[in-house]
Each structure stands twice: as structure tokens, then as C-alpha cells.
A protein has these predicted regions:
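C-terminal catalytic domains of large/alpha subunits in multi-subunit enzymes
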Residues: 1-151
Length: 151
């Protein structure tokens, strides 16, 4: 059978700067190109992609859910760091319209596709900057400089 009536395609590329003394990853620029079917409201489509980039940036470099024997330890925004508009990188958005016969008015989904590739793009940019692969999120001091979390 067919799992989905249609598929959303996109490509995301990130540019980062990594401080090799602290492991701090600064996401400088993200370019996202997405086939959105018919962009019924192009401004809202771009807004969704902007939000998805910042959300993916959070997953990749700042947000960390820490748990222990007694449950979740990160219970407030002092320890669970969400990116703000001040943390947002320069963003370049490219919308490609390719009317989808299965989509309402020819549109495709853009909510999840806008977020899904950002972490991988940032991880690949970290690899290009440092020569080290990041396999865990967030990309912090331990994962960037050592390749794993300290126990």
C-alpha cells in the first residue's frame, strides 16, 4: 500500500562557527529549500520554515532533556534552553511550487519538513568545521570536543 498520499521534499544547509576551547556552536546561517506544492499563502509558508529552522536549531545545540532515577531533572527554562529570536541565524528560504494533485488546493505539508533536516544540517556543518561527528543532541562541549557525553 501507499503509506502517504504525497511526500514533501527539501534540502537544508547550515553554516556554523565552533569555539574549540568551549565547544560552543554558533549557527551563523541556514538555507532551506522546500517543495511546498502550491504555496497558498507564501508569507505563512516562509514563516513556518523560519520557525522550523529555529526549532531545529534548539534541538541541535541547546535543548537537553535530562532525566534521573526520580524523573525529569530539566523542569524549567534555566536548565532547558530554548533559542530566542536573538539566537536565530541568518535564514535564506527558497520555496519551490510544484502543484500536488493529492494535496488540498495542490499544497503539501511544511510543518514538520521545515524542522526535520535542521539538526542533520547543523551536525554536518560541525563536522565540516571540526572534523568530528556529532551523534548526540545537543551539540555541547562534551559532544563537540569529545564525541560523547561525560558520565
Amino acid at each position: 500500500g501507499k503509506a502517504f498520499p504525497t511526500f514533501a521534499y527539501g534540502c537544508i544547509v547550515a553554516e556554523v562557527e565552533v569555539d574549540m576551547k568551549t565547544g560552543y556552536v554558533d549557527v551563523l546561517e541556514v538555507t532551506a529549500s522546500h517543495d511546498v506544492g502550491t504555496a497558498i499563502n507564501p508569507a505563512l509558508v516562509k514563516g513556518q520554515i523560519y520557525g522550523g529552522i529555529v526549532m531545529g536549531q534548539g534541538f541541535a545545540v541547546t535543548e537537553d532533556v535530562v532525566t534521573g532515577k526520580r524523573g525529569q531533572k530539566t523542569k524549567n527554562f534555566d536548565s532547558y534552553i530554548l533559542p530566542t529570536s536573538m539566537d536565530a541565524p541568518k535564514m535564506n528560504i527558497n520555496i519551490y511550487e510544484n502543484q500536488d494533485p493529492a494535496g488540498t488546493y495542490g499544497a503539501k505539508s511544511i510543518g514538520e519538513p521545515a524542522t526535520e533536516g535542521v539538526g542533520a544540517a547543523i551536525a554536518n556543518a560541525i563536522f565540516n568545521a571540526t572534523g568530528r561527528r556529532v551523534y548526540e543532541n545537543p551539540a555541547d562541549l562534551e559532544t563537540v570536543l569529545l564525541g560523547h557525553k561525560l558520565q
